[in-house]
A protein has these predicted regions:
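N-terminal export signals
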Residues: 3, 9-32
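Conserved catalytic cores of very large enzyme subunits
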Residues: 37-229, 260-267, 279-792
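Non-transmembrane amphipathic alpha-helical segments
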Residues: 205-219, 243-254, 272
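Extended non-globular scaffold/tether segments
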Residues: 230-241
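Short, Lys/Glu-rich amphipathic helical modules
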Residues: 250-264
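Extracytoplasmic/secretory soluble proteins
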Residues: 272-280
């Protein structure tokens, strides 16, 4: 065998089918003779194993690279860190897996979204646990302590906090929204990316390389552009190295396997070797390529899967390489791998809708994907169907059949309504808006054209409480929000609404500036190559995704408590202004007592008009609350320096978490209990039936935000026995402007029974808000919130 001197030699030999163990000694000897570290920085034959001293040594090397390079050469820093990270991150192929790619982030890593942060991240909890591991040597333990100290100051999140302007630091004084009673809080992450996996499957690694080389040979570009293109080629080499490294490990498993499992592992090995150098030619190769790229990039959503896998699926069927059952087996394994990443609030897989380049083939894939979802019946991926009046109606019918089995998927998105809404909200033409995709809990993004990380939360019910207490946080006694003189003479309904709106704007303004600051700091600390190479227009511009590369740089802000706030205004108007049963001071006193001794007055508040009953007295106030915050937030985009900045009215259990920090509200809600879910009515408040409820939830303007979600709960008896009536009901809802529906379909009494006998309901999956979960795994407070919802 020829001498192996360089990484290129190493890749070439692995590409010819040689196992890692056969060539690693020669490569390591070459590195040692040159005075470099073994394997140019990582132990190639080791995955994330139980050797904690080795893990610490690699984390120390990762930290050293960051210390030496990040401020002077961010592009090389990312590549060198990823060389160390990927062998620590990727795990062995487990029994039953049909693809490689299980992964777990090491406790210090680079990712757009890890450990509730983005960029260069640390899990202090995991590092502290590592420090106490009895197997660690004294030297390794000291290294861990030193790294905790370093990263507490030099993580991307910590470095961003150091450059908060004074007003931002004052207004956004805490990000601990899960336990502090905050009106608004920043989130530090770069989430919601939707990579162009169709381009990846059409071009492969070699095609991407040729596109970059074409830019380099054009003779155009600044020195910074040229550096980006050259570094991108190195990043592609690193991806190929990773795939071949993985293939070598799988080859060793092949040698030990037999029968069907041997053939399965051999196919994994062959796909890994193929995608390292060429575009995928089969469904198996494409799935393997996409999943590995997703893990390397840190992206946790999976785009329009029917578009990028549809052609290969159809071709495989035509060539008799696979059957439909083979495809279902592959997708079942993929669904399991997606679930293994534990990205509960993301993991979107999209099928259907307008704008696909290969609708016929894509639809055929969509059917097999729905069948897989029906059989696997998992919490994730968050399987989503886009539909329109012009597409094959059988897709929608099949979706209802799957939902009728008690599966919360697919979620339904109405293109006929959403595309025009996105055109207005994002200020883009139809050709761009047709590529909208929901990610995460329901936020819209323009597929591989825009980013819009939700990097802030705002609690409107908390802001109303602050307003009623004239700038004093009831729970903490802290004075915050607008200046106290703005409350002078606050007595009328219009006065209260004015002060409330000024407070909302006070927080939204700083959250918008924070979003842009996040892009300018965390977003610019690394080029995030594996995102940049699959986002328009990073390669052509020669710039990283968050640093001038992406076509549309946007942001989103998560709003909570909209319904409680609107219903509270309805109670104030009715009881204080119209009927004069209470003065404003009396109402505030009752709220401060959490209704203790004021049961009659609480019933007045509970009986006041509520959103969700097709009653314009309440619904008009919900429209006003939404229109104000959505409109003001949308106008902050240009001031903050982004293409878009939009509210999202979604839910990721934050209605429960933030409600537990929110005092009593005038809608009759008790202190420190859950808030209403997203665009839905307060649980049990929709008393006029399903038609009235659906008429209410289409009233807020959907053309000024980036997505709102609504849950609907049907009994299996209603949904299945009266299917034609249910279809007519949903058809009327979507025809009246309904954008989206997440449907829970369950037997009457199932939820209560599951709380009493959880062992009997281990497979009861429910739609919580922006995510699904096994009902028995949810906290009791969340179970109670779901139980409060009306079951039709």
């Amino acid at each position: 065998m020829a001498s192996i001197q360089t990484r290129r030699d190493f890749l070439k030999v692995l590409g010819n089918g040689v196992m890692v163990s056969a060539v690693l000694p020669s490569f390591l000897a070459s590195c040692a003779s040159k005075g470099t570290e073994a394997g140019e920085g990582h132990r190639m034959v080791n995955m994330y194993d139980d050797d904690k001293n080795y893990l610490v040594a690699q984390l120390k090397r990762f930290t050293h690279v960051h210390q030496q390079m990040q401020k002077s050469d961010r592009m090389r820093c990312e590549i060198e860190c990823m060389k160390i990270q990927y062998p620590l991150m990727f795990c062995e192929v487990e029994p039953g897996d049909l693809f490689a790619g299980r992964a777990k982030y090491p406790p210090v890593c680079l990712s757009p979204q890890a450990f509730d942060s983005g960029g260069y991240c640390i899990s202090v909890g995991a590092m502290s646990k590592l420090e106490s591991d009895p197997e660690l040597s004294a030297e390794a333990r000291a290294d861990v302590r030193e790294m905790i100290g370093y990263w507490s100051q030099e993580s991307s999140r910590a470095r961003m906090r150091k450059v908060f302007p004074p007003k931002m630091a004052e207004v956004l004084y805490s990000d601990n929204w899960t336990s502090d009673p905050l009106c608004g809080a920043p989130l530090d992450r770069l989430s919601g990316t939707q990579c162009d996996y169709d381009k990846l499957c059409r071009l492969g690694i070699d095609g991407l390389r040729k596109e970059i080389e074409s830019c380099l040979s054009s003779g155009k570009g600044t020195p910074e552009n040229i550096e980006f293109w050259k570094s991108s080629l190195i990043a592609l080499d690193l991806f190929s190295e990773m795939a071949l490294w993985y293939a070598g490990h799988v080859a060793e498993m092949v040698e030990k396997a037999s029968g069907i499992r041997k053939a399965e592992l051999k196919k994994i090995e062959e796909s890994l070797r193929h995608i390292a150098v060429a575009k995928p030619e089969t469904l198996h190769e494409a799935i393997q390529l996409v999943f590995l790229w997703a893990v390397m990039s840190g992206s946790i959503n999976y785009g329009r899967m029917d578009e990028y896998l549809g052609d290969l699926y159809v071709n495989d069927l035509a060539a008799k390489r696979i059957t439909e059952e083979d495809a279902i087996a592959m997708l079942s394994s993929l669904w399991t791998l997606i679930d293994s990443r534990k990205t509960t609030w993301d993991a979107r897989v999209i099928v259907g809708g307008k704008g696909r380049r290969n609708e016929t083939a894509a639809d055929k894939f969509a059917y097999v994907a729905m069948e897989t979802t029906k059989r696997v019946r998992g919490v994730i991926p968050q399987f989503t169907l886009r539909f329109s009046s012009g597409q094959d109606p059988r897709l929608y019918e099949t979706a209802l059949d799957v939902i009728g089995t008690g599966n919360p998927y697919p979620m339904l998105y109405n293109d006929d309504v959403i595309i025009p809404a996105v055109m207005n909200a994002f200020r883009v033409p139809y050709e761009e808006a047709v590529n909208y995709l929901p990610f995460g809990c329901g936020e819209y993004i323009l597929y591989h054209r825009s980013v819009g990380t939700p990097s802030g939360v705002i609690n409107l019910a908390q802001i109303l409480s602050l307003t009623l207490h004239k700038g004093v946080n009831f729970t903490t006694g802290r004075r915050e929000g607008i200046p106290s003189e703005r409350y002078d003479g606050m007595q009328t309904f219009d006065d209260i609404m004015r002060c409330y709106k000024e407070n909302v704007e006070h927080y939204v303004e700083q959250l918008a500036y924070h979003e842009k600051l996040e892009y300018d700091t965390i977003g610019c600390e690394a080029p995030y190559f594996y995102l940049s190479l699959l986002f328009d227009d990073c390669i052509s511009r020669g710039k990283p995704v968050f640093d001038g590369g992406v076509r549309y740089l946007g942001g989103t802000l998560e709003a909570y408590g909209n319904t409680n706030t609107a219903d509270s205004f309805a109670a104030i108007r009715k009881l204080v202004c119209d009927e004069k049963k209470l003065t404003l001071d009396q109402m505030v006193k009752i709220l401060d007592a959490d209704f203790e001794g004021y049961e009659k007055e609480r019933m007045w508040m509970l009986d006041a008009p509520k959103y969700g009953n097709d009653d314009d007295y309440a619904d008009a106030l919900r429209v006003e609350v939404d229109s104000h915050i959505c409109g003001f937030t949308r106008e902050m985009a240009q001031k903050a320096g982004m293409h878009s900045y939009l509210i999202v009215i979604i839910n990721n259990n934050a209605n429960v978490t933030m409600g537990e920090q929110t005092p009593a509200t005038p809608d009759g809600r008790k202190a420190y209990t859950f808030l209403a879910n997203a665009n839905a009515s307060t649980g049990g408040a929709d008393k006029n039936g399903i038609t009235a409820y659906l008429n209410s939830i289409v009233k807020p303007d959907i053309t000024i935000h980036a997505g709102a979600v609504q849950n609907m709960a049907f009994s299996k008896e209603t949904f299945n026995t009266y299917r034609e009536k249910t279809k007519a009901l949903l058809s009327a809802y979507f025809g009246n402007g309904g954008a989206q529906a997440m449907i829970n379909c369950m037997g009457r009494g199932d939820l209560q029974a599951a709380m009493e006998h959880p062992e009997r309901y281990q497979n009861l999956i429910v739609r919580v808000g922006g995510f699904s979960a096994k009902f028995v795994d949810l906290p009791r407070s969340t179970q109670l919130e779901i139980l409060s919802r009306t079951l039709y």
